[in-house]
Amino acid sequence: MDAFIQKFCEKYSLPIALSLQLLDNMEKFTFHKGDFLVQEGGRNSNFYIVSKGIWRGHYLNDGVDVSVWFASEGEAIFSSWGYVENTVSLVSIEAMCDSELYGISKAKLEVLYAGSVELANFGRRLFEQQFLGLESWMITGGSPRAKERYLTLLEENPELLQYVPLKHIASYLWITPQSLSRCLLYTSPSPR
């Protein structure tokens, strides 16, 4: 079984058989580093699972690029505005490296939800996870120590440092790139 399927099942408490049923109804897409799934002001109401790569959700705030979330192998991504309300996205979703996604239209996914209580419950749990993730991001942004926020991110997503420019990680952590550099310096193993 592919590693991303295992991660997906664990993250969203979905039995493997149901995740495979979901994947059977999805189409595989390939993206290059810098490609967008949707740009701020654009529309995309589809639902995706990351099978390879890292993605970033971000927006511009008075000309400053602010990272809202990162997603990697086994995680779901979608434009909340496009998926829920079929309106323009307030967030751009960008590939941080060459990536693969499995995608399904909202209409097709809702047919699957209607035919399976377990899949419908998965949809509910997914949105609960999204809300918790957003709230956590907002709260940790107020955490008194940049180092603590950085260590938490490293624990949850260690692969980000390999693919995501430090300026994007810094904006996600609500710190300057200089503060992030200090965090990297203080947390890296000291030479012997």
What function would you assign to each model-found segment?
Residues M1-E27:
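Cyclic nucleotide-binding regulatory module and flanking cytosolic helices
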Residues F29-F31, A71:
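Hydrophobic residues at beta-strand termini and immediately following loops
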Residues M1-F4, T30, S105, A146:
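N-terminal alpha-helical segment
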Residues F36-C97:
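Cyclic nucleotide-binding regulatory domains
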Residues F8, F31-L37:
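Amphipathic, Lys/Arg- and hydrophobic-enriched alpha-helical face
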Residues E94-P177:
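Polybasic "coupling" helices that flank or enter modular domains
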Residues Y186-P191:
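Conserved small/polar residues in nucleotide/adenosyl-binding loops
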